[in-house]
Amino acid sequence: MKKLLFKLFFALAFASISLHGQEKIQQVEFSSFGGMALYSSHYTINFLYKEFEAKQVMGEPTELPKEISLPNTPENWEAFTKKINLDKFKELKDGPSEQAADGQDKVIIIKTNKKTYRKMNAYGNDHDREVWYNLLQIIAKEFGKKGIYE
């Protein structure tokens, strides 16, 4: 009986330690900037709020800037972070800047309780492209959009 209780206590203690050590997503950001588009956009999602900002960088004034700021709920945040595969995101390889060819650079930043991960233009091969664009779709849906560039 003592042996069983000891094993149970040890298993619970180990489970508690491993859960405490898990990396938790605290914030997700997406930015696009530069190039011929002459505007930049920035999305931020965390457990408190969801924000979007688009602003014109140069040129004739247009209907920009646009700003959206919405409160977030713990339930929504939990569902959002469950959709993100942090391990796959960590494996993405940064791509070269696209501004030299008048393109926009795109950056995704994921902040956790342990570290900040930043990836730029990380869609250079089929595997990376799938992970990258799936994450962009997850972010877009948080704002009721079909795609991040809508």
Labelled PLM ranges:
Residues 46-52, 64, 73-74, 89, ...:
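Short, low-complexity, polar/charged sequence segments that are solvent-exposed and flexible
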Residues 22-35, 81-83, 90-150:
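Short, well-ordered, aromatic-rich surface patches in folded extracellular/luminal domains
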Residues 67-93:
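Mature extracytoplasmic domains of secretory-pathway proteins
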Residues 52-68, 119:
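Acidic/histidine-rich, surface-exposed loop or edge segments in extracytoplasmic proteins
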Residues 21-56:
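N-terminal export/targeting and maturation segments
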Residues 47, 70-79, 110-116:
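A short, structured loop/turn motif at beta-sheet edges
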Residues 1-24:
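Bacterial Sec-dependent N-terminal signal peptides
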